[in-house]
């Protein structure tokens, strides 16, 4: 199913998901450094593997995906299937609601 069919996202619920499942490896604040994963500030509309100062896998750079609601929705279901060879160890979020919530939060937090 695509993002168009996803339930409406809840920013607060998405923030909780980010804090429990993503924040150990990612930051969202402008100017915050990279951790295990890249800072996600300015994520929407950016091409995969292009954040300055972060060492990406060749897979991430070569995928050249444009991050947006649809691509993130698919990616977050199963990152390793979406970008084979990615360094991201996160197994993904199976529930459409969780993905919609996280995307709603990221849209706000990374803008």
Curated annotation (Swiss-Prot):
Residue numbers bearing the N6,N6,N6-trimethyllysine modification: 80, 94
GO cellular component term of the entry, any: mitochondrial intermembrane space
Entry annotated with the keyword Metal-binding: yes
Annotated positions binding heme c: 22, 25-26, 88
4-hydroxyproline modified-residue sites: 79
Family: Belongs to the cytochrome c family.
Function noted in UniProt: Electron carrier protein. The oxidized form of the cytochrome c heme group can accept an electron from the heme group of the cytochrome c1 subunit of cytochrome reductase. Cytochrome c then transfers this electron to the cytochrome oxidase complex, the final protein carrier in the mitochondrial electron-transport chain.
Record note on modification: Binds 1 heme c group covalently per subunit.
Pfam families: Cytochrom_C
Statement: the UniProt record of this protein carries the keyword Mitochondrion: yes
Originating organism: Ricinus communis
Cellular localization per UniProt: Mitochondrion intermembrane space
Coiled coil: none
UniProt keyword annotations, A-Z: Acetylation, Electron transport, Heme, Hydroxylation, Iron, Metal-binding, Methylation, Mitochondrion, Respiratory chain, Transport
Protein name: Cytochrome c
Coarse class of the protein's main subcellular location: mitochondrion
